[in-house]
Design a protein with these regions (language model features):
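Membrane-proximal intracellular helices of multi-pass ion channels
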Residues: 123-126, 135-148, 212-219
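Loop-to-helix entry and N-terminal half of a specific, functionally important transmembrane alpha helix
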Residues: 138-178, 184
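Hydrophobic alpha-helical segments of polytopic membrane proteins
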Residues: 1, 5-45
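Structural signal for the C-terminal ends of transmembrane alpha-helices
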Residues: 16-25, 131-140, 201-208
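A juxtamembrane structural motif centered on a specific transmembrane helix
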Residues: 166-219
Length: 219
């Protein structure tokens, strides 16, 4: 039985962003990361399970076991590269159609996008997610109270970390950790959390409008 390492890491980054929004000084963040780096030998020898160690080793050299533990990342990279600039066409990817890409509907959906939509489609996906993140931060800056700011920064941390980790998995920059691409991967609970987050962000924005109206009336 393998734990949900990706979710734990994402919650950790959400906490960091919310702590930053709360005004925690940067030196404490540096201290936390320094402590984590110093603890790496202890974590590796006494905390990490064997499958976790194997994922990290596979990320460094997936070609060492291309038919077993390194299969996912190798096939994901090949699919992304096969799309070139404009892609093979939506639903026309030969590797996707033959199920050569593992977990293509969720964890490796970006590899599917790379094959079928090409560099142009992948760039558009990234730009759309960046636009959402920008709008989230803008809403945070307009929030009328601290709670709204914390909500916005927490949602920003959720989407940003998920995006970075998923792209890192598909490009073999990070180990496979079962993280989906926000708003594009299939997944009931993941999608529900994301849309719930959108609703909370909208609530923060609407509350800002209500406060502006009340201020105008009081004047």
């Amino acid at each position: 039985m393998q734990g949900d390492d990706g979710a734990a890491i994402i919650f950790f980054f959400m906490f960091l962003f919310m702590a930053f929004a709360a005004g925690v000084q940067l030196r404490y963040f540096f201290a936390v990361f320094a402590a984590i780096i110093l603890m790496i030998p202890i974590l590796w020898n006494y905390v990490f399970a064997e499958y976790q160690k194997q994922r990290i080793i596979n990320q460094i050299n997936p070609e060492a076991d291309p038919l077993n533990t390194g299969f996912q990342q190798i096939q994901g990279k090949i699919s992304i590269g096969s799309g070139k600039i404009f892609g093979q066409g939506l639903f026309n990817g030969p590797r996707v159609g033959s199920n050569s890409v593992p977990i293509q509907e969720s964890d490796f959906i970006f590899s599917v996008a790379g094959e079928e939509l090409g560099f142009i489609g992948c760039t558009l996906i990234i730009l759309l997610l960046c636009l959402m993140l920008f709008r989230t931060l803008k809403t945070a800056s307009m929030s009328s109270d601290c709670l709204g700011t914390y909500i916005c920064f927490g949602f920003f941390g959720l989407v940003a970390s998920q995006t970075i980790f998923n792209l890192g998995m598909c490009l073999s920059v990070l180990p496979v950790m079962g993280v989906t691409l926000p708003f594009f991967s299939a997944g009931g609970s993941s999608s529900a959390c994301l849309y719930l987050g959108i609703g909370l962000i909208q609530s923060v924005y609407i509350q800002r409008d209500d406060d502006d109206i009340n201020a105008i009336i009081s004047e």
